[in-house]
Amino acid sequence: MPFVQFPNLFEISKFARQGKTVSELKCEVWTDLLSYLRTGLPTGLLSDFAEHHELNQLQAFTAVQFDEPCFVLPARAAIIVYCPEQDDMLSGVFEVDATGKRTFVRTSNTDIIGSAKSDVSGGKQIQSVGVAQGLETVMQMMDYILIQFHVQFGSFTDIGHFGMMRDAIQLYGTCACPFLLSLARFSTALSYLNAKLPSIVGLHYSGEPTTLGGIITRGVNLSAREAYFSKKYDPAQSLVASAFFTVKTSASGATVIEKMSSDIGLVYHMNRAAAVKVVSSRIGRLGEVANFGDDAE
C-alpha cells in the first residue's frame, strides 16, 4: 500500500540571525507530541495525524508535575520520566531579541542527571494513573514523521521504488532542521526500552550537522552506548519497565526528583548532538538516491 503523506507536516520558517535570513524546517506534529508527553493532553493535530495513519487515538492521562524540566512517558506499568540534557532542545526555549537574533535559553538540570553509577537506595516507583496505552502509538507517530521526511526529502517514495532528490537542492545547504536532532536524541533516551524507531538506524556523537544536507548525507555509526543498552535490557520487558527515583516535595508542593541512578537507562548523557542516519543512502552528484537494499524489488 502506497505511503500517503500527511498534508503540511513540514513547514519552512524564516527568521533573522546575525543580519542574515535563516530557514528552519519545523514539524508541528512533533511539537504537539512533546506537549502531550509533558501535559497528558492530546491536540487536534495529533488526532488528525493518528486518524490519517489509522493509528489508535492518544488518550489523555494525568501527568506528574515536576519542578524540573522533565516530562512523563505513558507506559503500561509505570510512568517513565525523561530528563533531558541541557542542549537537546527539550530543556529550554528559543527567544528572539530586539535585533531578531534567535537564542536558545537553557535551563539548569545538571543536578538532576548526575553521573553516579550506583543504585538508588530507597528509590520511589512512580505509578501511572489509568494509562494502559503504552508507548506504542507515540513511537508509531514518531516513525511516521521520519518516514515522511525520507519521502519528501529524497530517500524513498514507496517500498521497492527509488526517489530522486528534490530539485530545490539549495534547501539542503541552507535550511536547519533542529526538530530531527531533537527527535533523534529523544529516541536515544528511549533506547533502553528497546523501542528504537525503525527509521532511525544510527546516532552520531562526533559533531552536529546543522542543515538537511548534513543530516542526510552523513555516514554514522551506532554509539557504544546504544549497544550497551541493547544488551542490558530484555526486549520482552520493553514496555513494562519501571522507573525508580528518590523524590522529595518542594515548598510549593510540587514533586522534585532528588536522585536518580544513571545506570538504569533513564539518565542518558547526550553531551553532543545526535543526527539521523538515512538507511544505506548516499546522494550522488546528479541527485540520485541509492536504493534501500532489502526493500528493493
Curated annotation (Swiss-Prot):
Lineage: superkingdom: Viruses
Name recorded for this polypeptide: Non-structural protein VP10
